[in-house]
Amino acid sequence: MVQVDLITGFLGAGKTTFLRRYAAWWAGQGVKVCVLENDFGAVNVDAMLLQDLEAQGVELETISGGCDCDTHQRRMRTKLISMAMRGFERVIVEPSGIFDVDEFFDVLRDEPLDRWYQLGNVIAIVDALLPEELSPQAEYILASESAWAGSVLLSRCQLASDAQKQGAEAHLARALEACKCSRKFGPKEIIAKDWADLTGDDMARIAKCGYRQASCEKLHFEEHDAFASAYFLELGLSRARLERNIPSLFGDAACGRVLRVKGFVEDGGQWYELNATAAGLTAAPIPQGQQVLIVIGEGLDKARLEEELKR
C-alpha cells in the first residue's frame, strides 16, 4: 500500500519550509514521492515555493481550497485516485493552515482509497512564537491539527527564547485540553531545535514517528466564514515598500485580524517570496513568481488593507 503522510500546522507555522526538507529526504532514500499541496483560497501560492523539488525527483500535485467542503473532498479524492495509479511509494499531503483533518481521514476511509493507501506519519508544525491568544476557531484548529500527530516540530526556534518555546508547548496543551482531547505530548515527541541543525538521524526519527488516534470535541463552523482571504494582483509595489508596510497590518484593527500575508514580488529581475506573520517577515529568493499578495485572517477589510499596503 502507498504510505501517505500528513503535515499539519496553523497559518504561517512553517509547513511548506519543512515539507521541502522532508520530501527531499525521502527522495534521497530512493523513494518515489509525490506531494499533494492544498492551499486556503483559490490561488495556490505555496505550490510555487516547491518548484525546486521537481529537480530532486519529487512530483507535485495541487488542490486550491477556494470551494465548499464537499467539492474539496471530491477534488482530493480524485487526486488521490489518480496518484495511486502512478506508482508512487509515498504521498505527502500538506493541507492549508485552516483545515479540518477529519475531512482528510474521511477521504482515506472511502473505497477504493482504503485499499490503496495507508496512513504513515502525521507531523504537526507549531510556531515557537505562537501568539498567547487566538480566537476560539483558531484554538480549535491548532488542537485538531495536532491531535493525531506522532511528532510535533517547533518552528522558528532560532528566534525564540527557551521561555517562548515552553510557552508554545503549554499553549498547545491548553488548546487540546479545551477541546476535551486526551492527547498529551511527551518530551520525546516534541522536537524544539533550529531546523538548520536537523540531522539525518533527526529526519529518520521524524520519518517513522507514526500517528496517534485521538479526537477533539467538534467546534462547528465554516472555515470560509470564520477565516477570509484577500487577494491583491498586480499591485505594482516595490519590495522595499511591501516590507515596510506589511508588518503594520498585524497591529491595525481596522484591517481585521490579520494572521498571515504571503505572496511574491520582483526586485531587480529577481523574484522573492514574501511570508509574514505577527512574529516577523521574511523575503527569500525563488526561481519564479507572479505578482500576487494574499492576506489571510478574520474579519478582513480589503479596502483598508489595500490602503495600508499602498501608503
Specify the residue positions occupied by each region the protein language model found.
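Nucleotide-state-sensitive switch-loop elements of NTP-binding domains
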Residues: 2-13, 17-135
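Conserved residues at beta->alpha junctions
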Residues: 10, 37, 95, 156, ...
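Short amphipathic alpha-helical segment that frequently serves as the phosphate-/nucleotide-binding helix
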Residues: 16-20, 139, 169, 243-246
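Flexible glycine-/small-residue-rich
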Residues: 37, 126, 276-278, 297
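Conserved C-terminal guanine-recognition region of P-loop GTPase G domains, centered on the G4
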Residues: 83, 98-184
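Short aromatic/hydrophobic contact patches that present stacked aromatics
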Residues: 92, 228-230, 294
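C-terminal accessory "lid"/substrate-recognition subdomains
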Residues: 148-154, 158-288, 300-303, 307-311
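C-terminal engagement modules used by replication, chromatin/transcription, nuclear envelope/ESCRT
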Residues: 288-296
